[in-house]
């Protein structure tokens, strides 16, 4: 069971950082949309250009899809001792936002402007988890275990970014779905017997973080157990929880039907 839990944690953290699965980036009103490569690099395209990192993630390129020619935009400094790695979090207007992850879940965001050809650090301890239009779901760090963490909503402005909302202190799995935000929030334990992840509430709100509404709540089978939320959509909440007999089981809750079913592991 410990090995199973460790695997879940690793996959979940990778999904959030790289923008796959639970955190598919939406950019419906922006010119660029994203895809994930087999080696978990996020590439962005507007139909005529493609913005991407090379396989070693130390060079930023823009490729003209008509001519097939690629232009080197920026070389990226990589500190191998801190396991530093880059990923393109978002492309909005002329700005390319890059997340620089290092250490035990720390991260900074850098921005390259394709018009002015300038590159700078936008904000330290600032990780873009997901994006929609001019709004960003962010965190100050990304735990490498299953611990919840503070999540914020920022707005892209002409001067950089501006914080417009805080979703909560003990949150996870925040994502944009059809222009709305969905996220998991873990309330404080009611007594010493309950674990930090014993009870979870699922919320939705507007894209700017306002008008929060609780849509689902769930408790683990044991007070010292866990509930780990993997993905949230308009209809489905996918999670793994500790059952009464101490097993870790994955479930899907369908909000439309109100039914919960066990997910079979292949």
Language model features: what each stretch is:
Residues 17-31:
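Sec-dependent signal peptide cleavage junction
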Residues 52-53, 96-99, 136-139, 181-185, ...:
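Residue position within the beta-strands of beta-propeller blades
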Residues 27-35, 56-77, 103-123, 145-167, ...:
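Surface-exposed loop/turn elements that mediate protein-protein interactions on large endomembrane-trafficking
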Residues 9-19:
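Bacterial N-terminal signal peptides
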Residues 1-6:
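Positively charged n-region of N-terminal signal peptides that target proteins for export
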Residues 35-45, 80-91, 123-134, 168-178, ...:
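Repeated scaffold domains used in trafficking and secretory/extracellular systems
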Residues 45, 53-55, 90-91, 112-114, ...:
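Generic beta-strand structural signal
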Residues 141-148, 185-197:
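Short, conserved, GDST-rich strand-edge loop motifs in beta-rich repeat architectures
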């Amino acid at each position: 069971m410990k090995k199973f839990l460790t695997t879940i944690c690793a996959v979940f953290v990778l999904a959030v950082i790289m923008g796959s699965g639970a955190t598919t980036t939406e950019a419906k009103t922006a010119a660029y949309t994203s895809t994930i490569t087999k080696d978990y690099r996020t590439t962005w395209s507007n139909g005529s250009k493609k913005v991407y990192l090379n396989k070693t993630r130390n060079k930023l390129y823009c490729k003209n899809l008509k001519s097939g020619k690629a232009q080197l935009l920026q070389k990226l400094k990589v500190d191998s001792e801190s396991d530093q790695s880059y990923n393109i979090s978002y492309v909005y207007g002329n700005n390319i936002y890059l997340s620089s992850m290092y250490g035990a879940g720390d991260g900074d965001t850098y921005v390259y402007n394709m018009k002015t050809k300038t590159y700078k650090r936008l904000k330290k301890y600032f990780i873009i988890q997901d994006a929609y239009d001019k709004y960003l779901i962010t965190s100050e760090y990304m735990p490498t275990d299953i611990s919840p963490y503070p999540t914020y909503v920022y707005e892209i402005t002409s001067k950089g970014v501006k914080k417009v909302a805080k979703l909560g202190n003990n949150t996870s799995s925040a994502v944009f779905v059809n222009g709305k935000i969905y996220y998991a929030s873990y309330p404080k334990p009611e007594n010493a017997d309950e674990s930090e992840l014993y009870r979870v509430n699922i919320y939705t709100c507007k894209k700017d973080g306002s008008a929060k509404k609780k849509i689902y709540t769930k408790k683990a089978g044991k007070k010292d157990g866990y509930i780990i939320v993997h993905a949230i959509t308009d209809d489905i909440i996918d999670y793994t929880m500790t059952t009464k007999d101490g097993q870790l089981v994955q479930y899907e809750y369908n909000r439309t039907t109100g039914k919960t079913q066990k997910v079979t592991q292949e």
